[in-house]
């Protein structure tokens, strides 16, 4: 009995000791090789003491003070603690952190979601690393952020969804800023912040690092920076001063500065080879950014889609020799540029809408490297005052490529096969010479154009679309449009054959060469048709004085003279065998005479006036001349 009582007493004492030990373990313990924790429930203070590094916890609910997470008000880090571990204090209710003076590293997600933290946050000068998401979603931090002088790395999302105000200075010691480091969602960020100053040893700025922040004024990217990530400063609409890019910058990510409000000029530094998609686009701003000159580097190879769209640059745009590609919408609605847009021959592709609504350019020189003019790529360039030459090698002009660009004249290459839908809609006020080899003219390609000549279509033409040469304006028919088309080959397919969709104005006559196929009877697809053989009077033929050129627009070196007594014209070179029709016009475009030249010396034109123009056309099976020549003062009164 005595032994039983002794055993019972011993067991009771042991159980009591275990309970007391368990209670003590619940408010204190070890949290690193030489680090310890204790929680004072009366003050809500969690103290980390000892020395060295704290333990890293794999998950955010693994830390030993998890049971007191909602009761913790203050976290005190001892002076000998050097590292705050991963996932050490996430989602705690603390409102105050007291850092020790020797903390060198703050681990990933260390204070993630501590939304009761408020006001300012100051990191001690000893801190070198702020880990990924270390203070992410600490939404109560609305004061200023002060970073220590020894800080080197700011991790991804380190201050994500914080709401700091005031100026931010990134210390000179910092070398990298991680992705989304200072990003805040719209409903959390303040209306305005102070200025942003980047340290002079910074090398990389991560994706969306400052995206949608409210920093104001100018921004200088230090010379030390080599890479700016995608959307790094995207939609920083309060950055309304100048942007200065460092001379050692090599990579600028997509949309890096899209939606900012910078003013002044912009110089892209040498060494940059690509301007990525939307890098400087101002699409969603109420007004465009940049007001001065754009300077591009000689190292540039690629200009991405929407790279500079909706910006307000002024002056000339100089595309460097060596650029091979200009993306879709690259300069869309950049209407402040002036002078001639000259694309170097290195350019192989110009994307859709690339220069849409660039109405300040007065001239356009296209690259010899192009093979296709893309959809709307040069549309609505209202200010063009010089002829546009489509270079040899281009086989297709895309849909609406030059729509509403109002160019005074256009010259087509011998390689052209297809002219797309609305390609020159409401654009031309001139004579048009189509090249041999052209096969397709699509719907409304030349609708609402004031074509100042008969439409002469090569033997290669196969299809003409709906309203291709429509001349009915909403406010009346244009009286200057000629009333006929002249075909040098077989009858093509006319896609538009009825009423409002007809390929030509309904009152046009179609003229064809005898012996060519498909022309039968008196009408074709609803149009009156008549044969012409080179001796038929072309009463409705109009021309402008474009100089003496062949049908490929190459200049012809020749000489000729007019006998003032007889009116006989003598040409010093052969114009190929076959009949040549000559028609002269007065200054108003009215036919004044017609003649036939069968040899180079046997040709008499009657009733010529000194204001007349002479039109020569070789009407043989392979026409080679389509040449207006100014008579000037050689003709008799």
Task: Show where each model-derived region lies.
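Beta-strand signatures of extracellular beta-sandwich domains
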Residues: 579-583, 613-615
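Short acidic/polar inter-strand loop motif in beta-rich domains
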Residues: 618-628
